[in-house]
């Protein structure tokens, strides 16, 4: 083989590598090409005016609204949404920067999760509104991690882009809510009632700061031993951290005859808990809270929310209450079961 022929492949390879370098997307491309600019135009300008956000993925739709300065989730009984969650979404959308130009063929949108026509699609649509006027409509698709990037396009355009950054979008309405709705301080609880059973805390020694729980002197009915055993183990710590799986306007619920009422007397005030056990065992239950604050207590935001909503508890939290209720209604001994205290 001649020396001239042996150099041809090397020259071809060099040319290809050179073309790859000069056509590789640059982080300093001009705004004229549409790159290096925000994926959501004018978001920073309109941010303060935005009062509505719609999110869709397939058949799932979420509506967030601002009313009198308070954000709420219309898809979850108008339950309040913390401003930090909204701000995080808007900041991440604003920081989403067009980095590389990708396909503008609608037939290839599905490959990067930007096809919104499929009911089971993974594309996420986000609409931003100001006084009912649509100001932005973007579609987010597949994410990559090294470096962090997201495929995206404007809903009215077929042109797609690979953008710098990620946007964390929750497509479950409950995911926008602070699901911890009750955190009563266990150490401040002094009395508990469960239906007709009353318990009082007695300090038996300095080492036991929380004391022990005994039947109140004013109990009128006999309390089965198993019910007392379960109540002592489970009730003192039960309301220290409650989380919900769903919310419902209180006016929309019909309470069954199998509703248990508990009260907790604590330093902050008196907590009244109603749990509807009318549904089948293992399915959870709806829970309502009412609160009478002690004199001089600063009113907490959650206290004002409690009368408006019911909270769906998981079976994990309902099981000990149901167990005590069953023991209260029975005179026979239950088989020894592990305590559920600390739930």
Model region roles, listed by residue range:
Residues 1-343:
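Secondary-structure "cap/kink" motif recognition
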């Amino acid at each position: 083989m001649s020396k001239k022929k042996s150099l041809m492949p090397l020259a071809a390879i060099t040319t290809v590598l050179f073309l790859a370098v000069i056509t590789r997307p640059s982080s300093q491309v001009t705004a004229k090409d549409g790159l290096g600019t925000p994926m959501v135009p004018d978001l920073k300008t309109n941010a303060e005016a935005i009062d509505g956000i719609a999110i869709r993925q397939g058949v799932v739709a979420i509506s967030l609204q601002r009313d009198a300065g308070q954000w709420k989730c219309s898809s979850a009984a108008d339950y309040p949404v913390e401003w930090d969650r909204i701000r995080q979404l808007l900041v991440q959308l604003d920081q989403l920067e067009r980095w590389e130009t990708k396909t503008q063929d609608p037939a290839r949108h599905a490959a990067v999760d930007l096809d919104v026509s499929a009911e089971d699609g993974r594309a996420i649509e986000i609409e931003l509104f100001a006084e009912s006027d649509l100001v932005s409509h973007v579609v987010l698709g597949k994410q990559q991690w090294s470096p962090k990037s997201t495929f995206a396009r404007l809903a009215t355009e077929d042109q797609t882009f690979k953008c710098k950054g990620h946007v964390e979008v929750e497509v479950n309405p409950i995911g926008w809510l602070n699901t911890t709705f009750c955190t009563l301080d266990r150490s401040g609880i002094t009395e508990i009632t469960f239906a007709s059973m009353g318990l009082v805390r007695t300090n038996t020694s300095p080492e036991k700061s929380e004391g022990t729980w005994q039947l109140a002197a004013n109990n009128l009915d006999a309390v089965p031993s198993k019910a007392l055993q379960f109540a002592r183990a489970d009730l003192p710590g039960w309301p220290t951290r409650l989380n919900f799986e769903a919310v419902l306007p209180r006016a929309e619920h019909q309470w069954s005859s199998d509703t248990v009422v508990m009260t907790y007397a604590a330093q902050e005030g008196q907590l009244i808990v109603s749990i509807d056990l009318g549904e089948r065992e293992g399915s959870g239950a709806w829970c309502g809270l009412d609160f009478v604050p002690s004199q001089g207590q600063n009113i907490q935001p959650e206290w004002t929310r409690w009368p408006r909503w019911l909270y769906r508890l998981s079976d994990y939290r309902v099981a000990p209450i149901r167990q005590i209720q069953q023991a209260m209604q029975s005179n026979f001994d239950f088989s020894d079961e592990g305590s559920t205290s600390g739930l």
